[in-house]
């Protein structure tokens, strides 16, 4: 499985906006656990940001799931690093990396202000709702989505004003983290004419 986190850096005593931190944990396809479903939802704004960080860390360790975190707010990543749990923070997924960005391999997490990421995030949620919420019209299967707060957040979500939709951000990040990267196969340059040496038969008289 994998998780997604919409974090914050300022303690509630210094930030009166009321935006919460949020975390979702998600089961990817598996033969041993319920697949393609969210298994945990957490949204809170403790008085100190580090309390939120510790709550998220404990959830990640309990489930054993790595987390895809917004790196625009880097405090939670530093907290994981200081506690020795940096391996629980995912890097930017391969399919969302910018070809020429030097920061791709250095910074953990994913930026939330990239147009490509914002579009991919919205499309991931849209695809999940279509395939795994309610009855799938193509397969007839019933999806399992047990978190009403997240469903309500998805309904009200506005892609051009994402600030207050904490549950949508974290759930979408979990879905992005669960996506598989399909690498294009390189065309083989194999040439049997050069691989196998051919000898001309000498005709002796």
Region spans (language model):
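RNase H-like, metal-dependent nuclease domains and their acidic two-metal-ion catalytic environment used
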Residues: 1-92, 131-205
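Short alpha-helix plus adjacent loop in nuclease-associated cores
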Residues: 89-134
């Amino acid at each position: 499985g994998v998780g997604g986190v919409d974090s914050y850096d300022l303690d509630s005593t210094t930030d009166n906006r009321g935006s919460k931190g949020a975390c979702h944990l998600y089961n990817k396809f598996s033969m041993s656990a319920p697949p393609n479903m969210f298994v945990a939802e957490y949204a809170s704004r403790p008085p100190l940001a580090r309390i939120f960080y510790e709550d998220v860390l404990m959830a990640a360790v309990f489930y054993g799931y790595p987390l895809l975190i917004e790196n625009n707010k880097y405090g939670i990543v530093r907290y994981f690093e200081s506690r020795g749990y940096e391996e629980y923070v995912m890097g930017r997924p391969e399919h969302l990396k910018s070809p020429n960005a030097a920061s791709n391999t250095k910074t953990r997490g994913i930026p939330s202000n990239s147009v490509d990421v914002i579009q991919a995030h919205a499309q991931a949620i849209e695809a999940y709702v279509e395939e795994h919420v309610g009855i799938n019209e193509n397969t007839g299967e019933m999806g399992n989505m047990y978190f009403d707060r997240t469903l309500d957040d998805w309904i009200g979500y506005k892609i051009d004003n994402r600030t207050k939709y904490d549950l949508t951000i974290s759930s979408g990040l979990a879905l992005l983290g669960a996506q598989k990267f399909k690498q294009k196969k390189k065309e083989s340059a194999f040439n049997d004419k050069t691989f196998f040496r051919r000898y001309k038969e000498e005709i002796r008289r």
